[in-house]
Amino acid sequence: MEGLVRVPVREQEPKVRATNFEEVCYGYNEEEAVAEASRCLNCKNAQCMKGCPVSINIPAFIAQVKERNFEEAYHIISESSALPAVCERVGPRESQCEGKCIRGFKGDPVAIGKLERFVADWAREHGIKPKKAEKLNGHKVAVIGSGPAGLTCAGDLAKLGYDVTIFEALHRAGGVLSYGIPEFRLPKDKVVAAEVENVKALGVDIETNVVIGKSVKIDELMEKEGFEAVFIGSGAGLPRFMGIPGEQANGVFSANEFLTRNNLMKAFEEGYETPISHGKKVVVVGGGNVAMDAARTALRLGAEVHIVYRRGEEELPARKEEVHHAKEEGIIFDLLQNPTEILVDENGWVKGVRIIKMELGEPDASGRRSPVEIPGSEYEMDCDTVIMSLGTSPNPLISSTTKGLETNRRKCIVATEDTGATSKDGVYAGGDAVTGAATVILAMGAGKAAAKGIDEYLSGKNN
């Protein structure tokens, strides 16, 4: 029936894209975007907005796309989102905005993400920028980290007239958008750098190569540098491991390190001297989006790649689209299996993995059925590289050098969900530094909430 099926999106062929790092999805052209926008029912009580962590007025921007008012659509989106070109490319829209779309009850939900991406890409190609505050309000705010939480918080504060400086530890802004997500999913120069420039166009200053807690401490920013409030959006870059024998062998990487070498340091490009393992057979342990990114990157470097995950396909935490693309490209999924030991040769290099088969038992605290080992089912798989993708936690450098900043047992900063306020007066936090590794869009939502909290704090303090 008319309107039940969404307009398909063009992509690189799997066999072709598995050999390059160019973006997989081409996105909509103007005609496709207008046709897809026409499927929107423009609901008065739009459930899609309730599924959006940054509260974009989805029906309003889609209505403008339908009428080919693409610039107005962009301004509607950019009122709420500092990173519209990023969201669709990496966000779990099937469980957020599109998961709430009423069209999805009897057909395909409206492709909200693809429409947002189209508008953001159109704006970039036509030189359209977000609207800047008319004047500064005289208050200085420091933002630590230039990832999705930091960029969103900084952008929202700048729109309110605050003088905002972002301090970034690395040499390039973008945080996890720059170092953690591969080029074939999120182009760095075309998309990430352009989104960073849009935030700078709002008046935000970005200082790179500044490690807060080492180069300068939060207390010094507030007491000596004149910053009246600080937002911590430093992410969660400390990788977790399994604690099994052999993890210290040569050829074992955290997904964080493996992806950083490729994404930020361009190990995949000729002309760069960044060392990286070009394994012939790679085992990636884990089932999230980061595991898919690491596996698909290793594939493009020429490896046979196996994803080893202790639960089944239904329990994979990765986006369905990422799993689908990985399968299309030839990634092998070894599900309901778990490593018990990394096998090491006499020279200290990985030579294989000992794996035990699993079955699902009763649900655990997350609601997913717990994996249980099957006795006597162990076997060995040859490989020369193992990539651990088991999540990350915040680096304790900031919390350990900031007096009065409370953390929990996972070393995450304790902050209120609605405002991002921490235990230290004037200091706010959000994103992975608070929750541990989560999604880009949730980090953006936290940055947005903190910007509102900081504005309320400084407005009340100065009245």
What annotation goes with each model-predicted range?
Residues Q248-G279, P363-A437:
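FAD-site-proximal beta/loop scaffold in flavoenzymes
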Residues V119-K135, V192, E197-V211, P239-L301, ...:
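Glycine-rich dinucleotide-binding loop and its adjacent helix/turn
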Residues N42-E67, V86-V119, T165, R172, ...:
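Iron-sulfur cluster-binding cysteine motifs and their immediate structural context
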Residues D163-I166, L170-A201, D205-E207, A295-E341:
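Rossmann-like dinucleotide-binding cores of NAD(P)H-dependent redox enzymes
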Residues R17-E36, N57-R89, K106-A133, N262-N263:
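Ferredoxin-type iron-sulfur electron-transfer modules in oxidoreductases and energy-metabolism complexes
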Residues A433-G460:
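A conserved FAD-binding loop/helix module that cradles the flavin
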Residues H139-T165, A291-L299:
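N-terminal Rossmann-like FAD-binding beta1-loop-alpha1 element of flavoenzymes
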